[in-house]
């Protein structure tokens, strides 16, 4: 069994005033408040979501 790689992301900019789909993506990644951090599995789907809202998040 292989261990799944993870990726940590932090919400560094408020999604207020952004597109509704971008706000939904932030929520889909499990980020709520500013500076909240979440650790997710490193999959192509998660990478795509991070790429979509790259101006709102920071990869740690």
Curated annotation (Swiss-Prot):
GO biological process terms, semicolon-separated: translation
Keyword match Ribosomal protein: yes
InterPro entries to which the protein is assigned, alphabetical: Ribo_uL30_ferredoxin-like_sf, Ribosomal_uL30_bac-type, Ribosomal_uL30_ferredoxin-like
Any single Pfam family the record assigns to this protein: Ribosomal_L30
Record-annotated membrane-spanning stretches: none
GO CC terms, sorted: cytosolic large ribosomal subunit
Gene Ontology MF terms: structural constituent of ribosome
Key words, A-Z: Ribonucleoprotein, Ribosomal protein
SUPFAM superfamilies to which the protein is assigned, alphabetical: Ribosomal protein L30p/L7e
Cited CDD domains: Ribosomal_L30
Assembly mode: Part of the 50S ribosomal subunit.
Similarity comment: family membership: Belongs to the universal ribosomal protein uL30 family.
Protein name (database record): Large ribosomal subunit protein uL30
Protein source organism: Acidovorax sp. (strain JS42)
